[in-house]
Amino acid sequence: MSDVENQPFFNIQRVYLKDMSLEQPNSPAIFLEQDMPSVEVEVDVKAERLAESVFEVVVSGTVTAKVKDKVAFLIEAKQAGIFDIRNIPDEQLDPLVGIACPTILFPYLRSNIADAITRAGFPPIHLAEINFQALYEQRLAQLQQQQAGAAGAPNGTALN
């Protein structure tokens, strides 16, 4: 093989909106409310190997806005990307898929969610940047704790 074939390779093959739903269970009455909504945001990342060097990474976001105890809107969206990743050492592959890929996808997700919110008739809500490295490290720590707990428990049961 030539040196070019052994070079680390990272390519975005496709970025796409995989799924999106919007619910407004209390409209049109909710538009008459004067109070500012409270907004809750949840983000998750999943990755799947599609082929030897091809990965699908999905960043999911759920935004729930409530006025008092009434849901103004609920948006769920999944922004996905297909990435071709070759000649990357195994110890660098997981962070690349868990940090770099979601960082690339998140602006698309944020834009799609913001667009859906304004098209639904609500004032714009801009999602803050997310530190995917911190999320990745937090997820790793949780996995290590779970593995340590399972290793110390008899018959594979977790200790309380």
From Swiss-Prot:
It is found in: Cytoplasm. One of its GO terms (biological process) is protein folding. Signal peptide: none annotated. One of its GO terms (molecular function) is unfolded protein binding. GO terms for cellular component: cytoplasm. Its main location: cytoplasm. It comes from the Bacteria. The keyword Chaperone applies. Pfam families: SecB. Keywords: Chaperone, Cytoplasm, Protein transport, Translocation, Transport. One of the proteins required for the normal export of preproteins out of the cell cytoplasm. It is a molecular chaperone that binds to a subset of precursor proteins, maintaining them in a translocation-competent state. It also specifically binds to its receptor SecA. Homotetramer, a dimer of dimers. One homotetramer interacts with 1 SecA dimer. Belongs to the SecB family. This is Protein-export protein SecB. The lineage of its organism: Bacteria, Pseudomonadati, Pseudomonadota, Betaproteobacteria, Burkholderiales.
